[in-house]
Amino acid sequence: MSTAVETGSSPAKSNSNNSSSGGNNNNGNGNLSPNAKGVQRRQLRERKQRKLYLEEWSLGDEDGEGTRGFSVAEKLESSKFAQAGMVREMRGCDLTVAFLQQHGFNIPLLFRDKAGLGLRMPDPQEFTVNDVRLCVGSRRLLDVMDVNTQKNLQMTMKEWQQYYDSPQKDRLLNVISLEFSHTRLDRFVQSPEIVRQIDWVDVVWPKQLKDAQREGTNLLGGMMYPKVQKYCLMSVKNCYTDFHIDFGGTSVWYHILRGSKVFWLIPPTDRNLQLYEKWVLSGKQADIFFGDTVEKCARVYLTAGNTFFIPTGWIHAVYTPTQSLVFGGNFLHSFGIVKQLKTASVEDSTKVPQKFRYPFFTEMLWYVLARYVHTLLGHSHLEGEASLSEDEMAARPHTHLTHHELFGLKEIVMYLYDLPPQKKNVPSLVLDPVALIKDVRSLVERHCKDQQDLAITGVSVLKSPPGSQPPFLLYDRTRVKQEIKQEIARKNAEVIREQQQLEAGRAREAESDTSQSTGVGSVIGMGAGVEYSNGVMKKEQLENGSGVTVGGHGSQPEATFALPTDTLKYRPPKKMHLATALVAAAASSSSGGGGPVAGVGGSAVVGSSHSPTGGGVGPVTGAGGAISVIATSSSYIEGGQVGGILNMDNCHSPEGGGAKLSPNLTGTGQPRRRRTRCKNCAACQRSDCGTCPFCMDMVKFGGPGRAKQTCMMRQCLSPMLPVTAQCVYCHLDGWRQTPVSPQTKQLASADGPSALMECSVCYEIAHPDCALSQLDGTEDAADAKGIVNEDLPNSWECPSCCRSGKNYDYKPRHFRARQKSSEVRRVSVSHGQGGAEGHADGNTLLPPPVGQYNDFVFTSESEMESGTVSGHMTHWKHGMKRHHQLEVKTERNNSCDTPSPGISPNAIGGDSKVGKRRKSDDGTSVSSSMHESNDAPCGSSAEGAGGAGNANVSTNQWSGSGGGGGSRKKNSIRSQLAQQMLNSSTRVLKKPQYVVRPASGTGSSSSSGNGGSASATNGISNGSNQSGANSCGAGNGERGTNNGGLSGSNGLGNQHYSSSQNLALDPTVLKIIFRYLPQDTLVTCCSVCKVWSNAAVDPDLWKKMNCSEHKMSASLLTAIVRRQPEHLILDWTQIAKRQLAWLVARLPALKNLSLQNCPIQAVLALHTCLCPPLQTLDLSFVRGLNDAAIRDILSPPKDSRPGLSDSKTRLRDLKVMKLAGTDISDVAVRYITQSLPYLRHLDLSSCQRITDAGVAQIGTSTTATARLTELNLSACRLVSENALEHLAKCEGLIWLDLRHVPQVSTQSVIRFASNSKHDLCVRDIKLVERRRRNSTTANRSWHHD
């Protein structure tokens, strides 16, 4: 617990407990623990080093495996610790604010009964660890400590509960850090009343911040206040926690609900705190029982029902004789401020990691000052808090402060004053910290003569705001389970509601875009629509006065939601896109034209059913985005009149090709269920791989367990329909039986496979004969057939979707196990035989498709301007009327050179109404036509402006040339379309183009190449009346194969341009121009095109790269390697060792490297045979850089390349080395002079441990005296004038900095300069350099970059 007495995150425990409790082979009763059964393991040495407790615990010391040097059983029986008078027993009613005001809180308090404390707990007879799991969640991650190995583990609450309840335990585990505030358990545990009255979190911390807390765990990223108020401690028998002090000097309340505890207590005297610091830093906690080293140490026994209070700073250890369940909490208060701050200083001296400290400790001190000033002076220093008027403050009586509070406020000010600026942590809500400190000074002066007897009022000066505490509830397991079910249902409803709102919003946006671009011919926006809000469908009037009522009787009540496990019916989700509604509308209106109707005014599109009388309406155009509800009916729509009631509950329209309802819920309002594993394929039978992203997220592989996904290698290849699935029409299951529970269906497989089929388009489950029978009586019933998908069991494209053409509009549903990032699902558009007219040679130029939901909406604004609207609509109707006799398909990554031949039903299975979907060679499915059709070339002519209008085909690739032009290169449009479709993006795909001006003599349109598809500007082409053959011919013109080659096209013919004429794509020209651009502009140039990107990353343009203060991500490291700089600056970056090692091994030309203030572990990565021969190395202000680190860096590398072994350091060619502000001494200077023979510039400024002896090392080195020209010793306070005698031996020294060196006088520096043969002079008091000349000034400027 990061809090209560047994907290593993407490400062002391983070250092001491880890080693002392590790490897104990004796339990509390003196018996051998389970790890010590049989012969004890022989050890060669004892492990006495201090254990490290970091976030990455695996990077610390090895797990403690040694035995303790003392017996806990002996300490339990020793009479030395049976001391009286160190714990005060009290009744609950006696612990009040007046008691603390009078006596303070300096001694532990024991309450045998919780009566009078205001402490409320669940019933100990009924409340168990299983109830804790129920309240905090089975997936809540716990920090678990293995008592014997001292290894940090992470377990889910469910796993911990199973371990806790198991009778046989193979190891000792302890949970001491489960903070349950803002969880369901928070309401059933109420802290003592005295804690609620004085806890700074309740009375000081801003309430709006505490109310903003949403995270139930203790993640610092989501913590809005110090979340340490309520902890649950669960320990098994024989757990022991060594001596520690609770973090931040917090006090602790501790209630034993079940089991028992034993405490050893040591008072926080100055002597004991000093001994404690030495004991923690000694690393011998496992050998020494700290209670033996102090004068007074008392042992206290606690049993179930006892409540215990431990004051600030008390050193204590805990033992668990019986399995226990404990609730507790930590709190700061105003009656122990001095000791709280003193304990914080102990944490600094013992180097407790920040993870184990009180969160927001410094910020809390600022809020304490602000609250006291506002309460006693009326001045507000917090944002959003109003100050009190002087009259109001004058009317109040004078408040007397206790000496605990008065001296505490002074200590807080001094504590904050002594902190360095980067650690003052002034909260953003504090407006002016300086004014706040001044007001605190005035407050202390005003209350310095307060009388102590008048300060005992029984009322705390700082009061908690009303409503700061959650109401207490009696624990009821049944009610909690019901709340959990309701919460799951509510979350399901929220997810579904958000999805519907998102789809409706997209629909409105697309409708607005479409309504702005309509207004041609037969497409008219009439403003009729359906509004969907709060589960109620409302009608809006059409312009002619007729309305549409949706929802059976004009309204639809909000659906109720239940758990997925509460239903036995399986109905997969139905998805309905706008293009489907448009296809259905076109099919219904193909027999005749009525008044045009456009449903673009609402959040849902109402599709009309087929009109038997032939008086259907014209084309119905809707929004190009997602829609929430599309309703159909068999009502008649004639002459623009809309009559009847549209039934929202209809999932299928038996008459005509109306659109289908696309609900997100089943008929009972319950969420959909997914397919189940087949348990037969190789993926189902294998184990987790342990390497994929989902495995790395699993708890058992060390991940956080948030994704909740199965292994990618175990994703079933043939997922089956659940046995509870039923037909949507006859409501029978796949074996023609009444659906029953899954338990009774265990032997269903013995009766054969299920006969149900799931449509991959509309996701409707039905028997094939039931689906076909629903079409009886329609004009297309004879031709209605379905297409079976052999890649997925019980999957097909139902006859209804095939008849309406929806199976060509959308990609079929596929599973991640089959999905490849480079694969694209089929995009097919069916049209009639008239679509082949105008083809000169069967070659096509196919423009790229628009977004997923806009398959039949205009491709671009230029088409509308060119008058191609009528062509679209005319061809659309003809294509739908002729029953898709021609199919244009684009398979995954397969060029569509030849069409798929039509396969008649007789070729598959006699008179079967179900077609087959054969598998292609590459594993992708190729659909065979469900109608007999003639072979046709796979392609269609491009859209000509005002052309014949018989080709509205969208694909993402170039068709092969029939005249031997060869296959076209796959272009960037194809990859973009693949990514767009796989991500289900609704964004309209736009063709990327180079910003290149055409050369003289070209027409108004040009196509840009480099592997991309051609596109025309200002419409499709200039020739507005050219035929489809001319348009196709323009697309079949030869394209330049050179890099950057372009081919232009206009209505009169093709003109070709070589790459030499296009200077904007000439790499040589680009590099010359790029030399004049700053690096940030070069980064922008990389996103223009591939040619520019290759030219912009040329190493000649990136001789120097400055990545200081940047986050070292993988993309940044890759960018550095691509540019191959010679001078790399990584100052003030948190680069890791593995990152720097990876980087330097791939920069062989690197000469200058700067690593200022980088982690020392990263700097040690230079000790490798792969390090480039650097000439300049800057290690200034690297924390932890000492003599040992310098020795490691400058020693020969331990690794070697094949056939090569270095006997000298890889940094031996260094000419410049900067070590300013590091912790090196004279020993490091000796390493430098011995290992770097070519060193010319050495920077040792601000190195406080450098003395005359280190300078003497420079003077006695033959290489240094001959080659060293520049030396910086500024701010080296231990250097004296004797160092100048050694520096006089350096014959080449022409620059010396001795500024801020107090032991060197200016006169001695002047003498040194005058005795030199290099014509030196003294500037800026103690800076020795050569007399300035024009040439030397230019040569010296690089030192001050």
UniProtKB/Swiss-Prot annotation:
The modification Phosphotyrosine is found at residue 53. The keyword Transcription regulation applies. It catalyses: N(6),N(6)-dimethyl-L-lysyl(36)-[histone H3] + 2 2-oxoglutarate + 2 O2 = L-lysyl(36)-[histone H3] + 2 formaldehyde + 2 succinate + 2 CO2. Its cofactor is Fe(2+). Keywords: Chromatin regulator, Dioxygenase, Iron, Metal-binding, Nucleus, Oxidoreductase, Phosphoprotein, Transcription, Transcription regulation, Zinc, Zinc-finger. The keyword Plastid does not apply. It is an enzyme of class 1 (oxidoreductase). Residues 973-987 have a biased composition (Polar residues). Zn(2+) 1 binds at residues 678, 681, 684, 716. Histone demethylase that specifically demethylates 'Lys-36' of histone H3, thereby playing a central role in histone code. This is JmjC domain-containing histone demethylation protein 1. The gene is Kdm2.
